[in-house]
Amino acid sequence: MKLIASNKKAYFDYEILETLEAGLVLLGSEVKALRQTRVNLKDNFVKIIKGEAFLFGVHISYLDTIHAYYKPNERRERKLLLHKKQLLKWQIEASKERLSIVGLKLYFNQRNRAKIQIALVKGKKLHDKRQNLKEKALNKEILADLKHHFKG
C-alpha cells in the first residue's frame, strides 16, 4: 500500500466510528497526478445521491504537461465504488444519528488501484478537542521526562 495523502484534520475534528475502503472513478490525468501526490484531502465529504456515493471537495491538481484545451475541474465530484448493501447501511446510519462520511486516506493498493478510506464520523465538541490537546501535551511531556531521566 502506497499512501498518497492523509486527512489529518479529520482525526482532530471528528470521532471515527467505522471505516471502509472504496474505489474511485478517475480520469487518466488524475491518476498521473495522484502518482505525483498532487492531491489535497482537506475539507472533503461524501454525499449519497440516488443510491450512489460521490466524493466532494478533494483537490487533484492537473499536470503541467496537460494540454490547455483539456483541463478538468480540479475540485469536481468523483464517484465512489461501493457495495450496495454497505452503502444503504451507512446511508441509514448517517441519516438516523446525524453522522457524516469523510475521506481519511488516499492510497494505491497492491494492484495499483487508487482507493480511499472513508469513515462514518461524528463531530467533536470544542471541549473534546481541548481535552485531546491537553492529553497530547501531557504525553509529550512525560516522554521527554522519561528520556531525560534515562539519559542522565
From Swiss-Prot:
Localization per record: Cytoplasm
Signal peptide as annotated in the record: none
CDD domains reported in the protein's UniProt record: SmpB (cd09294)
GO annotation, cellular component aspect: cytosol
Gene3D superfamilies referenced in this protein's UniProt entry, alphabetically: 2.40.280.10
Keyword RNA-binding found: yes
SUPFAM superfamilies linked: Small protein B (SmpB)
Domain of life the protein comes from: Bacteria
Function summary: Required for rescue of stalled ribosomes mediated by trans-translation. Binds to transfer-messenger RNA (tmRNA), required for stable association of tmRNA with ribosomes. tmRNA and SmpB together mimic tRNA shape, replacing the anticodon stem-loop with SmpB. tmRNA is encoded by the ssrA gene; the 2 termini fold to resemble tRNA(Ala) and it encodes a 'tag peptide', a short internal open reading frame. During trans-translation Ala-aminoacylated tmRNA acts like a tRNA, entering the A-site of stalled ribosomes, displacing the stalled mRNA.
NCBIfam families referenced in this protein's UniProt entry, alphabetically: PRK05422.1, smpB
Name of the featured protein: SsrA-binding protein
High-level lineage: Bacteria, Pseudomonadati, Campylobacterota, Epsilonproteobacteria, Campylobacterales
Gene name tied to this protein: smpB
